[in-house]
Amino acid sequence: HLANLKAIDPMKIFHKTIDYKIYNGNHQIPVRIFLPGEKMEDDLPVFLFFHGGGWVTESIDNYERICARLASATDHIVVSVEYRLAPEYPFPIGFYDCYMAAKAMYTNQFILNTDPDKITLIGDSAGGNLAAAVSLMARDQGEFLPKRQILIYPAVNNDYSEESPYLSVRRYGTEYLLTCLLYTSDAADDT
């Protein structure tokens, strides 16, 4: 179904959205729920979506059309997470927002009563990194265990050296949008 996203006319997509908040301590994490039809059904599978943007740009608003298409094309509910961005919120703040959103979904502390076996973590670029990292932390913490991920061109290799196997990194490895150094824990320690 994911391969058919471009075939769907975005102007003909019917979708209903619901804005909701998940709590992470004193912070409210905004999420937007995209329904593939007119009403919310608890038995539908869910994509928990983390947007890309190098951990410093993008939002659930900018990903509205993508998430609506995803819901419509796959008959899944899509829950898009508005995690906090660097540099205003250095690592690991945005990551913990994503983790807490996933924990709320998997432990039924959310508006949807979704079967945990029907939840898939999904993200592109930095969002793919977050989906993978949330899965690893969930495994390590033992609080819940995601069974599926869809990682779309995930940012998973942090080698920005001149010896990198990737030409783009060797040429542009110090450019701001490629490295987003303010999101790394090393940069956060320097502030």
Where are these regions (language model features)?
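A glycine/proline-hinged amphipathic helix-loop "lid/cap" segment
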Residues: 1-36
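Short substrate-entry loop that stabilizes the transition state in hydrolases
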Residues: 40, 53-74, 79
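Short beta-strand element of the alpha/beta-hydrolase
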Residues: 43-51
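Single conserved hydrophobic/aromatic residue that forms the stacking wall/gate
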Residues: 183, 187-191
